[in-house]
């Protein structure tokens, strides 16, 4: 009986551990997204290049009502998953989509170039459907 209980607890803890991982990193901009009150001119959606640009030039972003939503290491599928929360819900006029570098580097495993292009195309279609101009 103890053995069954031990295995049950072991598998339950593994399942709970897997559920706590935030693959798309929704938490990263959760509080910042809630604090945006004015419609941004542009949201920059991307990976480390975008992430570091915002950190190195904060005045440029603030002075122009630009918002940075880059996350280092992210691939196009992760960006697509968080696109609603980090772009659409902010209602920008324009979204600049900077991605594909980490897909090519296989940061999240193998992905075909066709799938990368489809992810980018999907983000563009979602943006257009919400009245946002996509720039790739």
Where are the predicted features?
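Alpha-helical cap/lid subdomain in secreted, periplasmic
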Residues: 59-65, 80-136
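Short, glycine/serine-rich, charged loops/turns that create anion-binding
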Residues: 11, 49, 102-103
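Serine-esterase "nucleophile elbow" of acetyl-processing enzymes
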Residues: 17-96
